[in-house]
């Protein structure tokens, strides 16, 4: 069966590099499913889970906090703002951080501070949802 070369990279590190049968991820306009031979595409990515079905039938789940996707017929590159392997997600920690960010939002004075905290809240909410879904055995 044909495969895709997949790279998931954050600003800090390469999270995944390998061959995959398909990739599912949260595109700007909705969920995207990428198979080998897909039409070239560039899209923004929403916060959520990137599901990679490896060539060996194993599965990788990676939370991304947003970023850019590039698709070529034989490759997928995810340039994520932040990327965390599913095994490293902690729902309780994400919920606690979200509560702290909500408090910061209540205390924010100017529009720039509010925008930064709102972006962080959106990312933390998506992270908590992704952690909950992965804990329940669902990825999408």
Swiss-Prot record:
One example GO MF annotation: proton-transporting ATP synthase activity, rotational mechanism
What does the UniProt entry say about where the protein is found? Answer: Cell inner membrane
What is the membrane topology here? Peripheral membrane protein
Q: List the disulfide bonds.
A: none
Q: Which Gene3D superfamilies match?
A: F0F1 ATP synthase delta/epsilon subunit, N-terminal
Q: Give a yes or no for keyword Amino-acid biosynthesis in this entry.
A: no
Q: Which UniProt keywords apply?
A: ATP synthesis, Cell inner membrane, Cell membrane, CF(1), Hydrogen ion transport, Ion transport, Membrane, Transport
Its predominant location is membrane
Q: Name one GO cellular component term.
A: proton-transporting ATP synthase complex
Q: Which InterPro entries match?
A: ATP_F1_dsu/esu_C_sf, ATP_synth_F1_dsu/esu, ATP_synth_F1_dsu/esu_N, ATPsynth_dsu/esu_N
Query: What Pfam families does UniProt report for this protein, alphabetically?
Result: ATP-synt_DE_N (PF02823)
Q: Can you state the subunit structure given in the record?
A: F-type ATPases have 2 components, CF(1) - the catalytic core - and CF(0) - the membrane proton channel. CF(1) has five subunits: alpha(3), beta(3), gamma(1), delta(1), epsilon(1). CF(0) has three main subunits: a, b and c.
HAMAP family for this protein: ATP_synth_epsil_bac
What does the UniProt function comment say about this protein? Produces ATP from ADP in the presence of a proton gradient across the membrane.
Family statement drawn from the similarity comment of this UniProt entry:
Belongs to the ATPase epsilon chain family.
PANTHER family noted in UniProt: ATP SYNTHASE DELTA/EPSILON CHAIN, ATP SYNTHASE EPSILON CHAIN, CHLOROPLASTIC
**Protein name per its UniProtKB record:** ATP synthase epsilon chain
Look up and give the organism this protein is from: Bordetella pertussis (strain Tohama I / ATCC BAA-589 / NCTC 13251)
Gene for this chain: atpC
């Amino acid at each position: 069966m044909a495969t895709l070369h997949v790279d998931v990279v954050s600003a800090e590190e390469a999270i995944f590099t390998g061959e995959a049968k398909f990739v599912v991820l949260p595109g700007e306009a909705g969920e995207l499913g990428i198979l080998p031979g897909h039409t070239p595409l560039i899209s923004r990515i929403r916060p959520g889970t990137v599901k990679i079905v490896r060539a060996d039938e194993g599965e990788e789940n990676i939370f991304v906090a947003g970023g850019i996707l590039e698709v070529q017929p034989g490759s997928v590159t995810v340039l994520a703002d932040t990327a965390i392997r599913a095994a490293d997600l902690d729902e309780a920690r994400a919920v606690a951080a979200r509560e702290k960010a909500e408090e910061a939002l209540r205390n924010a004075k100017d529009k720039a501070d509010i925008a930064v905290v709102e972006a962080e809240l959106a990312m933390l909410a998506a992270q908590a949802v992704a952690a909950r879904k992965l804990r329940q055995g669902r990825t999408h």
